Every structure is written in C-alpha cells, then in structure tokens.
Amino acid sequence: MKTLFFATSNINKINEVKQILDIPKIKIEIPQNFDIKETGKTFKENSLLKAKALFKILNNKQPVFSEDSGLCIEALNMEPGIYSKRYDQYKLGKKLDNNEKNHLIIDLMREQNNRTAYFICVISYIDVDGTINNFEGMLKGTIALNIDYYQKNGFGYNPIFLTTNNKRLSELNLEEKNKISHRGIAFDKFKKFLMQFLD
C-alpha cells in the first residue's frame, strides 16, 4: 500500500479526487489544517508551492501531491485565473459567497460577445526522493448568461460554465463531471503515471 498526502483542505476537491484516484494499492491522506498562501503567478507555481510546503512539513520523506485550478475567461484577460478562489477580494476587496461570486462574473460579462472560457488544472507530485512531476488538464466551454440556482452538483463556478455540449457543469453528477473536467483529465494522467509503479 502506497500512501500519498494531498496538499489541500478543500472538501469538494477531496471528494472529486478520491473518486478518480480509486486505486486499490493507493491510500490518500489529508493533512489537518493545511493552509498555504498562494503567491505564485501561474497555476503551476501555486501547485508546486503547496506540494513543496507539505513535503517539507512531512520532513521530505513522504510522497505528496497538490493541485491548483481555476477559471480563465478570454474576454476578461483570462481572469479570474489564479485568483479564482479569491476573485471577490482581488476585484472588490471584500468576501462574497459562491452565488455572489458567480453574479460578479455574470455582471462583468454582461456586454461581452466572446464568452469562451477554460477551466485549467495543474497537479504537482513530489516523490519520496524529491522528484517532481506535473500533470495538466483543461476543459473548454463558455460562460452562461445566467446562474443555475437549481442544480445541486458541483461547486465554485460550475453553475455558470457551459460545456461544449451546452450542459452546465452543475448539471453533471460527479462521475459524469470527472470524465470531462479539467481536474478529471489531469488526475487521469496522474493516475496512469502512478499505475506504472504499482504493477
């Protein structure tokens, strides 16, 4: 049994990742009270920052992985981007709930014809010997004209993101979402990488 430590405290990410990395010989541990300031300028920098921080906390002796992801909108100069989680504070200087954050995006996009957007995910894995590998995933879609208040699936910007088949991410259950999402694609690459060493 190989134990991997996941550098996150986001319960939604944990649930998605545990379903994708459902490998019999892999056990995923979540560190308690893990909270690192994301000061990188790219998803990759932030992902590496978190992985390296946890690797150090575990005395450079345990395999760790982290991920950073976000929504990039062409008409908004690829924002929210790395500020996706804290776009409210970056843009308005105050904290908003999820619905309010989605409203902010809808308002900013009100006059925009180009609604093309991307969800991007970067995973950083550090093995026990300190070797680093990165895995990326991207989902292309568009920003909806309004918010889906009724679907209970997904989190964050899922209620305003339309996939190429015109379905909101919030309409998909976890299994459906993981097949096409940025996180699903990146973690599928990571899973295949891990499987090489478990045979």
Curated annotation (Swiss-Prot):
Cofactor needs: Mg(2+)
Pfam families according to UniProt: Ham1p_like
Catalytic activity: XTP + H2O = XMP + diphosphate + H(+); dITP + H2O = dIMP + diphosphate + H(+); ITP + H2O = IMP + diphosphate + H(+)
Signal peptide: none
Keyword Aminoacyl-tRNA synthetase among UniProt keywords: no
GO biological process: one example: purine nucleoside triphosphate catabolic process
Molecular-function GO term, any one: dITP diphosphatase activity
Subunit structure: Homodimer.
Role, per record: Pyrophosphatase that catalyzes the hydrolysis of nucleoside triphosphates to their monophosphate derivatives, with a high preference for the non-canonical purine nucleotides XTP (xanthosine triphosphate), dITP (deoxyinosine triphosphate) and ITP. Seems to function as a house-cleaning enzyme that removes non-canonical purine nucleotides from the nucleotide pool, thus preventing their incorporation into DNA/RNA and avoiding chromosomal lesions.
Protein name as catalogued: dITP/XTP pyrophosphatase
Species this chain originates from: Borrelia recurrentis (strain A1)
